[in-house]
Design a protein with these regions (language model features):
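Hydrophobic membrane-embedded alpha-helices
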Residues: 2-15, 21-373, 388
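Extracellular/periplasmic envelope-modification machinery, especially enzymes
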Residues: 192, 217, 232, 254-257, ...
Length: 492
């Protein structure tokens, strides 16, 4: 089977649509809307999307530079995700100090654990139940999923680098990744019990890694942008994607958080269904991609990270300000306030920082020393210029984006160089070494990377810029902005 090459990819609006579905399910679940008892499964969709996009980005970076660019990767994750989190934590603590001072200390500890992305383990260690309905919702009880994603972003690139070093062949790596995922699903089932609270099973990094890992496995065989599929393949992809959507809707409408089926097979089936949707969503001209690219879904997906972050503080605090006997009035007010806060955060915090950096966000000018100003974005540009990115986001990744920098200049040796001995074929004088480096066709090509590095000297390990048709340079292909394909997803 030919090796899939992770070429530069363009903005993928269908991934915004997938994010939108995930965050809608989660919000409806936390609003206790009848019929959406399985809405918590939306978090699992974010996990799989994040695993796919993060791994696509890392593979792309390795094919382009020979390394994973870990320093740049981690710095961008921080820039992508932390500003909005800090804003939500500060706003929550201020509101708690005014409205419910008796709970301030407990919220403070939750906020600290969320800031350092260990909230899931803090919840487990403190024996706090995620499913406790009697104590009422807490404003930061949803931060556990962001903690799992950030822990994955920290550990997974290191593990991936080790696997590239030890196994080399992607088929072997895929088997190892799938085996790890199956082990995670087995542990999820083993720790769940109808006789006990299942927060440990539901929020453990080890028990929830399965969805992230299977998303990562897909990235090895199905690039984040499929360039060409024939009519028959497109039909099968649509069958796969539509079946996946149907399966997820069925799970959301029939599953409950106290159901043991959620742990024995529900989350595993959810992951497989999400993989089917992803396969169809990144292929050109599929019906699934068209449906998920509808403008309302795209709009929600772009703001899914903020919606995920803000919805639980709003769910917790709105009843203190809005006294009503109608649950629908409370739900409508909660939704309106959540979307408003998420939109303001996206407009004035998240997007400017993604585009211009922390300091540049104040002046509207890019200040990153390793990036160049990007041309104004538009639909035509967005269709062709970008690179695979992660998500985050709820991942959200929401989170849950592509790189936000223009491709760096390359220094090419001026003297004529005989490439025959290096590349195993004759290169014409107008064929750049960079073109060859971007398409490793076999295992031998990867082994020649050090030789190529002597001819083409990259000044940075960053992938090329992403253009978002609405947000401008730096937007991520699936709704978020940065080098995750749209936050994270991406990214709750």
């Amino acid at each position: 089977m030919p090796r899939p090459t992770h070429h530069e990819t363009s903005y993928l609006p269908a991934l915004d649509g997938l994010r939108a579905l995930a965050v809608i399910f989660v919000v409806l679940y936390h609003l206790d809307v009848p019929g959406f008892g399985g809405g918590l499964l939306g978090v699992g969709m974010f996990f799989t999307l994040s695993g796919f996009l993060i791994t696509s980005l890392l593979i792309f970076t390795r094919e382009r530079t020979g390394g994973l660019g870990l320093k740049t990767f981690w710095l961008r994750r921080a820039r992508r995700l932390m500003p909005a989190v800090i804003l939500v934590l500060v706003a929550t603590l201020i509101t708690a100090a005014i409205a419910v001072p008796k709970n301030f200390l407990s919220y403070l500890w939750e906020a600290i654990s969320a800031l350092f992305y260990v909230n899931n383990w803090y919840t487990i260690a403190s024996s706090t139940s995620y499913f406790d309905r009697f104590g009422g919702p807490t404003p930061l009880s949803h931060m556990w999923s962001l903690s799992i994603e950030e822990q994955f972003y920290l550990v997974w690139p290191l593990l991936l680098a080790l696997m590239f070093l030890v196994f080399k062949r992607r088929a072997v790596m895929t088997v190892v990744i799938v085996a790890l995922a199956l082990g995670s699903f087995w542990l999820l089932d083993a720790l769940a019990s109808p006789a006990f609270d299942n927060t440990r099973a539901y929020e453990g990094t080890d028990t929830r890694a399965g969805g992230l890992l299977l998303g990562a496995a897909l990235a090895f065989w199905w690039p984040a942008r499929k360039r060409q599929v024939n009519h028959t393949q497109r039909c099968w992809l649509d069958v796969l994607g539509l079946t996946g959507i149907g399966a997820i809707v069925y799970l959301v409408l029939t599953t409950h958080d106290n159901s043991m089926g959620l742990y024995t097979w529900g989350l595993a089936l959810l992951t497989v269904a999400t993989l089917g949707i992803l396969a169809a969503a990144v292929a050109p001209d599929t019906l699934v991609a068209t449906l998920l690219s509808l403008p309302p879904l795209r709009w929600i997906g772009e703001r899914s990270y903020g919606i995920y972050l803000w919805h639980m503080p709003v769910v917790a605090f709105v009843p203190l300000a809005v006294r009503t006997d109608s649950p629908w009035v409370g739900a409508i007010v909660t939704l309106a306030v959540t979307v408003l806060l998420a939109s303001l955060s996206w407009r004035f915090i998240e997007n400017p920082i993604r585009k211009y950096g922390f300091a540049g966000a104040l002046t509207g000018r890019r200040t990153d020393p390793d990036t160049a100003p990007a041309a104004p974005a538009g639909d035509a540009v967005a269709a062709d210029v970008s690179a695979p990115a992660d998500d985050a986001g709820i991942i959200v990744l929401p989170d849950l984006a592509l790189a936000d920098a223009a491709p760096p200049p390359r220094t090419v040796v001026e003297e004529p160089v005989d490439l025959t001995g290096v590349l195993g074929r004759t290169a014409s004088t107008d064929e750049t070494a960079g073109d060859v480096a971007e398409e490793p066709a076999d295992e031998a090509a990867e082994e020649r990377t050090p030789a190529l590095a002597m001819i083409v000297l990259d000044h940075t390990d960053e992938p090329p810029a992403t253009r978002h048709p609405d947000a401008g340079p730096g937007a991520e292909p699936d709704g978020s902005e940065d080098d995750a394909e749209q936050p994270d997803t991406d990214e709750p």
